[in-house]
């Protein structure tokens, strides 16, 4: 089997018992499966939920807290308990785990985004298993990933993974809720995530987690757009992850074999960078940047909104609506001076492009 880079996301419901506390046997089962993958030569990045679930009972909460301060306090207690458990179980297989806690700002800030990539890659190259979780104890509610499903998709893109495996307590995607409809049919394979599928998916999470099936499909859609195929399902035993890679997993495979990876600069522009302004372009410019692989030139710019600096990321709108996002080579004030100007009106030593094609990402609304 070809050696692959695999991101594995395991949710709280697959790590805890009926009371919501850490289930040592479940964790041991997952660790053995990851160890089996490592033994085959695969690189593994582990997105683990469970910090809040591991900590809330320790704080005396009868159930998972719903307030931000309650969740953050539980995460502060639970994250260390969770990591200690992983360290002990991975030690049985001579594997060293490494903890990385991320916030949305770590992706939004360009330099921190690069640092996150460099750190994960260094750990992988040295044979460790990075265990990544959102830094729940300090995350601002408005600036979170939403749940670890989306975090796993963004991480899989960041490190150019070959596959994202999302393990859950449901063995794949069904055409209706199998708990309520015994005749529900499972999809063994779907090529893409459609709006119809998203509309059918239940959105509620479990009592010990935040991510329902809809969040997993949204994560899968994001991963596919970043060039990463996805598996959503369940599994038991030491070889469950190996069986998933072989195509024998108990769940749903999502995506096509010819997906193209997206470089990190474009990922940052598309999914993480703050938007500082808006540029409106004419039909010819819209066609050039969305269909013909061209750069945006001043001649096609018709309007500018926002006081953005050079190097900022802006949205670009054409006659058909949002065309995409790009990193501008002009400030708003500079662009006002040259908008509508033809290329032959520039001196040869001047830079012409408003947004270079390498700094552009098309977006379909």
UniProtKB/Swiss-Prot annotation:
EC number: 2.7.2.11
InterPro entries: AceGlu_kinase-like_sf (IPR036393), Asp/Glu/Uridylate_kinase (IPR001048), G5K_ProB (IPR041739), Glu/AcGlu_kinase (IPR001057), Glu_5kinase (IPR011529), Glu_5kinase/COase_Synthase (IPR005715), Glutamate_5-kinase_CS (IPR019797), PUA (IPR002478)
Enzyme class: transferase
Binding site for ATP: 9, 168-169, 210-216
GO biological process, one term: L-proline biosynthetic process
Cystine residue pairs: none
GO terms assigned for molecular function: ATP binding; glutamate 5-kinase activity; RNA binding
UniProt keyword terms in alphabetical order: Amino-acid biosynthesis, ATP-binding, Cytoplasm, Kinase, Nucleotide-binding, Proline biosynthesis, Transferase
Ligand binding (substrate): 49, 136, 148
PUA domain ranges (all copies): 276-353
Main localization (coarse): cytoplasm
Gene3D superfamilies: Acetylglutamate kinase-like, PUA domain
One annotated Gene Ontology cellular component of this protein: cytosol
Subcellular location: Cytoplasm
Pathway participation: Amino-acid biosynthesis; L-proline biosynthesis; L-glutamate 5-semialdehyde from L-glutamate: step 1/2
Catalysed conversion reaction: L-glutamate + ATP = L-glutamyl 5-phosphate + ADP
Family, similarity comment: Belongs to the glutamate 5-kinase family.
Functional description taken from the UniProt entry: Catalyzes the transfer of a phosphate group to glutamate to form L-glutamate 5-phosphate.
Classification via PANTHER family: GLUTAMATE 5-KINASE (PTHR43654), ISOPENTENYL PHOSPHATE KINASE (PTHR43654:SF1)
Entry protein name: Glutamate 5-kinase 1
Organism: Bacillus licheniformis (strain ATCC 14580 / DSM 13 / JCM 2505 / CCUG 7422 / NBRC 12200 / NCIMB 9375 / NCTC 10341 / NRRL NRS-1264 / Gibson 46)
Gene, per the UniProt record: proB1
